[in-house]
């Protein structure tokens, strides 16, 4: 998921009521035309199964693991990765517009923490805004991967979702 944050508070997120909205995932489509849901429903398809288990990377490449998809190297896998990066850039770009700029870009979660190529592709899209990453730092998954002269600081932050959930439960 992606969030636009202003003064330490999220102003928008890519997820809606369910994880179906937002970015394409391993087996989820992400944003789609509501008319498609109506069309498939009228045809008698199991929408729950299609939207949650058979969409996203799985529908394009037949696999859900992005590491495996990157190793395939054929036109389908390249298209799937291009779509994935494009949608991320689209979200970030819209948040930059709403926020009237950005100071930091933070990558986290499985893909954000562990796949330098995806981070590079995303960051390269914002080079025109003065965002510059250091290839060496990026390849090593260092905490700060932006160059010193970059107008935007780029971070790779490790997450521990289970710990965060446990802390929130203790606060109830």
Where are these regions (language model features)?
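Glycine-rich phosphate/diphosphate-binding loop of Rossmann-like nucleotide-binding domains
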Residues: 41, 45-49
């Amino acid at each position: 998921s992606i969030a636009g944050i202003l003064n330490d508070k999220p102003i928008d997120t890519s997820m809606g009521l369910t994880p179906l909205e937002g970015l394409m995932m391993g087996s989820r489509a992400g944003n789609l035309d509501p008319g498609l849901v109506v069309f498939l429903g009228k045809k008698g398809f199991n929408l729950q199964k299609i939207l949650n288990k058979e969409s996203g990377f799985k529908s394009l490449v037949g696999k859900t693991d992005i590491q495996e998809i990157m190793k395939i190297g054929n036109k389908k896998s390249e298209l799937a990765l291009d779509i994935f990066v494009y949608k991320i850039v689209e979200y970030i770009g819209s948040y930059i517009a709403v926020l009237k700029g950005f100071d930091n870009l933070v990558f986290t979660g499985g893909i954000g923490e562990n796949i330098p190529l995806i981070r590079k592709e995303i960051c390269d899209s914002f080079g025109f805004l003065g965002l510059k990453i250091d290839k060496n730092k990026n390849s090593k998954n260092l905490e700060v991967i932006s160059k010193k002269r970059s107008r935007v600081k780029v971070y790779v932050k490790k997450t521990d979702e289970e710990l965060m959930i446990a802390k929130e439960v203790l606060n109830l």
